[in-house]
Amino acid sequence: MVRVIGAGLSGLAAAWCLTEAGAEVEVVEAAAGPGGLIETVRTAEGRVERAANGFVWNETTERWFRDLEIAPSPSNDASRRRFIFRDGRPRRWPLTVGETAGLAARAGWAWLRRDLKPHDAETIAAWSTRIGGAPTTQWLAAPALQGIYAAPADRLSAKAVFGGRGGRRGTRRRRPRSRGIVAPAGGMGEFIERLFERLRARGVDFSFGCSSGALDPSVPTIVATSAPAAAALVAPHAPRLAEAIGLIPMTSIVSTTAFFTPTSSDLRGFGVLFPRETGVRALGVLFNTEIFKDRGAGRSETWIYGSLAGALPLPSPGEVVDWIREDRRRLTGRTDRPVALGPERAGAPPSLPVYDQTVLTVQERLADLPPWLALAGNYLGRLGVARLLDLSREAAERVARR
């Protein structure tokens, strides 16, 4: 018997990989049901994704979709257009001609000196300024990465973001080649629902609404929880690792899907990122009905607000409509009121790890884990649903070898 603690994406994926290896599996989850943050809500206006809206399509995700018999829905051609807001309008390339020339010159000089890779303890802000100049950091690197990591560039470790020290025990990973973005035809929730159904059909035992308690060294275990929960569980068995995990700062995001009446002037594309210097409070906006088909008859937009590791306030449920309207006015010049809002997720704790130097320390100390114990989660050096699936498979392989 192998025990998996956590029934979010990482825990369910680890359980699946264990059953593929012939193991008997039990899953313990503190929440009332599976899925963690991932959920698709179907409303009268269209689908609302509570967390990630799609998978990077590569060999890993293609295999998962095939194994679970899920039909992939590819992103629309319009989603290839991505924008960064500068000087009052969205731009495909936010740097001026002079700034672009400066970026090319600096990057070329760094390449000649073989100095493109991040230095030890170098932040994203320091690295991108060294390689491309201050405008590159301000208008390109910082907004692009705040849209992924929800943290400011001067808090992000360049080595942690760009792969750090590789996999466990310093091994180098080969990333599967990306071929765009896809989602299940029924939304991201379909992936969770199908995986949960198939696991139950395979005889996996689920216990919901249960705390896991202390880990039992006689039971091979995968901990697939948040970083704070994992630190507490791991502490008796790998104290140095648990200490590092517990020191990872966590940040919060609030995403609200708003439905609008379409107009001929609507921006066509994946979405827009907003540098902090623009005065727009949102980190970014996703144009859902431009990214995937069947996301609603009207215009569906998801506005994302983040605390940036405590640097910014988050809107309250009563403020979010006003925030969206003001930010949308800055983007479009219009003051349209949403036709409807998607449901709020109330009281969610900080869920995203800040990828600072501590993440690298965690990677270094993974070797402290006893053979019967493995970890899976978004604090281990890989973000994004496709990469979390890889981590879950590696965790399952580790305990299955025992």
What residues fall within each predicted segment?
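Short loop/edge segments at beta-strand edges and connector loops
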Residues: 6, 76, 206-211, 377
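Conserved flavin/dinucleotide-binding core of flavoenzymes
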Residues: 94-95, 285-402
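Dinucleotide-binding Rossmann-like beta1-alpha1 core, especially the glycine-rich loop
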Residues: 44-118, 143
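Mid-domain catalytic core of redox enzymes
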Residues: 210-315, 331, 364-365
